[in-house]
């Protein structure tokens, strides 16, 4: 189980929790979105809200995939491929949120 330190709250962020990575390091989903809301104020609030819902869905999907049990090598490969695809999508959404400006 991988474990990181959230750069906003300094608490641990571990496999099985909703967190992502920015250029600053690991960050809990809730910490990241709250920080961006505060930083942006009312500017880009609607766009942030939309992207936050997307990122939440992607991170939830990743957590659901972690619970899937596979018993064959093919199943494990397919699961790993799907996990990487969703992980990449979550990374792209995180970058879009990070790029939002006032």
Where are these regions (language model features)?
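Intrinsically disordered, low-complexity regulatory segments
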Residues: 1-23, 29-102
